[in-house]
Amino acid sequence: ERFLNEKQTDLRWDKVILSGSSHGSTTSARFAKHQKVARVVAFAGPRDQLESWQSLPSATPANRYFGFTHVLDKGWTADHYCRSWQMLGLAKFGPLLNVEKVKFPFGNSRRLITDFDVDGNANKAHGIVVRDGRWKDVWKYLYTHPVDKMGKPVPTDPDCTMKIRPN
């Protein structure tokens, strides 16, 4: 009942957290552009590298989007995720932080990465951030950190290729 409005005819979207991994994170982030939600947690994504919807106006404020991925994930090495995170405006809420080097509360940033050893396996890297219990503190942060506590704005990442579409 806590997720239904008083008449029980619709969801109380302000209580809903959308989350997904890979393409599921893309779907979550894209949905939140149209419907204001409590927050969006994107694991290994969003991955819509050739589109520009990420920079469109959003029903969900940008400080409510959180991302976490592995640096060997092909979506990261090909600049898909960093591009999406920049287009979503996440640099306004703190720097890119490696959770292996910076601990909770991760500078109140919305952009978290890990370089945990996956034996150089990009496929393993893609799903590891949702499978390995070693990141319980990260998950708790992503799902419960107060959205009004934000890191300081930083410039966009000059190493992130923003134009991925071929000419």
Role assignments for model-derived ranges:
Residues 5-11, 33, 54-59, 147-151:
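Surface-exposed acidic, glycine-flexible loop patches that form ligand/cofactor-binding
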Residues 38-130:
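The feature captures the conserved acid-bearing segment of alpha/beta-hydrolase catalytic domains
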Residues 112-167:
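Catalytic active-site module of serine/aspartate enzymes centered on a nucleophile-bearing elbow/loop
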